[in-house]
Amino acid sequence: MNAVRLEWDHVGIPTVEVQPDETFVEATRVWVTNPRNHPQNLEFLRYEDDSPVTGLLRDQPHVAYRVPMGTLDALMEAADEVLLEPWEAQKDVVRVGFVRQDGACIEYMEYMGDPAAWFPAERGES
């Protein structure tokens, strides 16, 4: 999978503090901010106590990359360790999976639709 070109998207930072304009992701029970609204493309993640996310992914920052359509599953298989299996984080928009690769937490983002439609405000919702 070394030939796959990854496009940097954001850095995710775990936090316990409520952030402005958070969006709730039910599948992982985490509040996230939109990294496109941050000058350094930072995403803050605030986990609910009952979140199924544990370990490295919950405790350490992650780097997120957009991956070409059709490559997510192969990238997951090639990783040192799968931290969170792929799922549709936003229906018909983006599928994501988390891995540990070379000691780092990595999020792979495979867009199926418009990347600008990830967050409610970008879809015209509140």
What are these regions (language model features)?
Residues L56-A89:
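Mid-chain, well-packed structural core segment of small domains
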